[in-house]
Amino acid sequence: MDLGPLNICEEMTILHGGFLLAEQLFHPKALAELTKSDWERVGRPIVEALREISSAAAHSQPFAWKKKALIIIWAKVLQPHPVTPSDTETRWQEDLFFSVGNMIPTINHTILFELLKSLEASGLFIQLLMALPTTICHAELERFLEHVTVDTSAEDVAFFLDVWWEVMKHKGHPQDPLLSQFSAMAHKYLPALDEFPHPPKRLRSDPDACPTMPLLAMLLRGLTQIQSRILGPGRKCCALANLADMLTVFALTEDDPQEVSATVYLDKLATVISVWNSDTQNPYHQQALAEKVKEAERDVSLTSLAKLPSETIFVGCEFLHHLLREWGEELQAVLRSSQGTSYDSYRLCDSLTSFSQNATLYLNRTSLSKEDRQVVSELAECVRDFLRKTSTVLKNRALEDITASIAMAVIQQKMDRHMEVCYIFASEKKWAFSDEWVACLGSNRALFRQPDLVLRLLETVIDVSTADRAIPESQIRQVIHLILECYADLSLPGKNKVLAGILRSWGRKGLSEKLLAYVEGFQEDLNTTFNQLTQSASEQGLAKAVASVARLVIVHPEVTVKKMCSLAVVNLGTHKFLAQILTAFPALRFVEEQGPNSSATFMVSCLKETVWMKFSTPKEEKQFLELLNCLMSPVKPQGIPVAALLEPDEVLKEFVLPFLRLDVEEVDLSLRIFIQTLEANACREEYWLQTCSPFPLLFSLCQLLDRFSKYWQLPKEKRCLSLDRKDLAIHILELLCEIVSANAETFSPDVWIKSLSWLHRKLEQLDWTVGLRLKSFFEGHFKCEVPATLFEICKLSEDEWTSQAHPGYGAGTGLLAWMECCCVSSGISERMLSLLVVDVGNPEEVRLFSKGFLVALVQVMPWCSPQEWQRLHQLTRRLLEKQLLHVPYSLEYIQFVPLLNLKPFAQELQLSVLFLRTFQFLCSHSCRDWLPLEGWNHVVKLLCGSLTRLLDSVRAIQAAGPWVQGPEQDLTQEALFVYTQVFCHALHIMAMLHPEVCEPLYVLALETLTCYETLSKTNPSVSSLLQRAHEQRFLKSIAEGIGPEERRQTLLQKMSSF
């Protein structure tokens, strides 16, 4: 508040005039000599001047001007005399009140106190008194008590009791600039206490102590002095109530008393105001409700920061006991009569009731001397007896129902406990939708921008609007609009709290089930919002997008989230942006208690119900994978808090575990989700896999691999995962074993051993090669179980390996088992190679091994994954290097013996021949029915992969020839010869196969011709041209036997261009 002009102005002129008239009336004496008895004759002009100044007609802030005038008067009273010229000059410049005070004649405390009493300004008196320095404050109250106790009138008693009541209600006014200026003036210019005339000897209090305590002790002493002048039931009730309240609040209550609940607080306010409304003599009877509420709050909110001294407490208790004995019968008679309906009587009974309750607690918890305990006990008994005889005053009072209006007034004026009252306002169904309730909500929206309040308002609106009450639809719409505005203004964490509450209370349909009819344009907003999101997905617009979705998601969470899930999968490139929006709402991790997926989170349910198992293209599957990753490991945009909506364990449980079967269409996608989840969460500190039951998870993967061992025996509809994806399943198994082993300490030793034993027993049901893949996992606990025939060709340690009878592994199958071991991993392949028992110096043993190797290769190849086949390819090269494997080279595609150095290409030629022999074996009468068409496609693809690597090897050897063999050793002719052989072998294999599966071999043949053509053009010599012509005719003769016609013609045309 602006201090305004305190110098010459209309108000000061009126005040000055009042004092001049009083001075004239008191002439020839000076006003500084005025006594109490003179006031009635002299004081009227001053009182009338003050009333004129503080009238509403005189100024827009009448109370402020009354305060200004009283401050000026009190400052004048406190001004020391005489004033030196230097002091005058200084204060004229610095003291805000000095210049205006000089317009007033010199006055004394009698004028100040009588003026305050005439104006009934007990509240202002205490505000100004408490603004003074502590010692001066005490001195001024002492003067007031001296003033009151001399020639005490009924008005003195009334004013004294009001002042005492105001002291107890005082809470300070730290934001009042007038009081601050008055306090500053007093601290700066007033003399110390000992410079005051007649200082009270008792006042040597600690300036740091609570300033109220000494004042209350002084007032208690004052009460004892004027006791005999307290006449009439009303005054006696007030005196007893003040004394009881002082003892209760400042002595008997705990050091940190619990505030009464907001409901009790409102009830107390309603009771006080109802009594005022019925008590026509009460000064607040005619006041507006807002003023009544403000004052009633002060009456019911007494608190203390300190305790009265023990001496004061027991003096007070004895005096209260004395007064009850002396006045008790008179007051009981009045209270039981029809006269006992005033606020004073209500206060007395209420204060004594509170005293009685606290006295019992005080006696139970406080250590007192025998004498002190007796004083309190006797008083408590006296109070209880008094209350028993007057209980009807509180019990039988019929109060009007004004609680709602009071609550709204508390909110409107933002009183001390207005936020607590907001919660009652938001929850009270009886008040909802009245005109006053709607108006209060509309004008105080800012107070309701709290998640709990928004939720309570929504609960109230839903309960009331779905009950039998007839409420206009327009009013419901208006209230919902107001609530949604409050929600829109919340922070993102606040919105999440509201969303969590909505999901908890009304489930996945949110507000829509109860309020959709009143939430205008939801479907239109939904479509418009998501059209804009998909068209302008960018981090710059993320905050706006989150705000738009926030409103939609509380109206209908299910529709909103499902729409986002669908768009994130279908709309290319939007998944990351939409995931960022979704992860801004961690409340979506809500776990539904009912429904088809009662154990799953709401987010998982929406994904499963909307997009899972409904993908139409590989791109949609890829977007779904990336969406899951973004929801598990959200990218944190600047300024927007996000949290994971999916935990890795629930992703595995919901999207992987149920689908780890070869006959399930989603198995391939589930494996990709599996590996993505493992890799994305590899760095997590906590061992999250524990919640997924890792050992059953390992067994599920082993079961899947077991089905691959019987892959081509299964019907086509049960082969939903290609053999190519076997490598992914193996990789996941290896990674999972590493993670579980690394976290073995999270299991107790007993549980770990039992889990390993359980898994080992379960693996006995599966193909033995599956168990071999867990060799490292079981190491130190179980030996590797392999077919007994493996021991016939390998030097296996019985400490590490054990033989087991396996069906299908009879005599002569040792090499088959050995080759299957080599497929498992590169490490085991090296180990098997080192343990192999073949005598290189025995040609017959090498020949038999080579034949056995070919037979085993034919048996293993069709069931190999690409990585397993590549290991066999490398193994074959190692065997050729070690001369353990003999592959005789035939002359079937050689017109003449070439005079070439083919040694650098020996392995490539042998491999090419070996592959030809393998396919001759596979296509033979005894084997051709092993595989369905898809199986032939698979082996052809494996062959083409090996032949492609073989061609790469030829190019590398040829290019490095001059540096390795010497400048004169050009290997061009040798490389061309190898190309012709590979080409012929490829065409030979094509001729044995069904045309439908030959496309990869046909492409490889064309690539081989390209290699031949490119290399032959680097040597333009006559002999080279002649050789090229011969080879061209020879290759064309081979190609003539190839079908169909289109392929044959393409190959011939390619060769004609050489």
Swiss-Prot record:
It comes from the Eukaryota. The modification Phosphothreonine is found at T84. The keyword Aminoacyl-tRNA synthetase does not apply. One of its GO terms (biological process) is spliceosomal snRNP assembly. Keywords: Acetylation, Cytoplasm, Disease variant, mRNA processing, mRNA splicing, Nucleus, Phosphoprotein. Its main location: cytoplasm. Transmembrane segments: none annotated. It is found in: Cytoplasm; Nucleus; Nucleus, Nucleolus; Nucleus, Gem. The modification N-acetylmethionine is found at M1. GO terms for molecular function: ribonucleoprotein complex binding. The modification Phosphoserine is found at S86, S205. Residues 714-735 are annotated as: Leucine-zipper. GO terms for cellular component: Cajal body; cytoplasm; cytosol; extracellular exosome; Gemini of Cajal bodies; membrane; nuclear body; nucleolus. InterPro entries: GEMIN4. The SMN complex catalyzes the assembly of small nuclear ribonucleoproteins (snRNPs), the building blocks of the spliceosome, and thereby plays an important role in the splicing of cellular pre-mRNAs. Most spliceosomal snRNPs contain a common set of Sm proteins SNRPB, SNRPD1, SNRPD2, SNRPD3, SNRPE, SNRPF and SNRPG that assemble in a heptameric protein ring on the Sm site of the small nuclear RNA to form the core snRNP (Sm core). It is linked to Neurodevelopmental disorder with microcephaly, cataracts, and renal abnormalities: An autosomal recessive, severe neurodevelopmental disorder characterized by global developmental delay since infancy, microcephaly, poor or absent speech, and inability to walk or spasticity. Additional features include renal abnormalities, congenital cataracts, gastroesophageal reflux disease, seizures with onset in infancy or childhood, hyporeflexia, and non-specific white matter abnormalities on brain imaging. This is Gem-associated protein 4. The gene is GEMIN4.
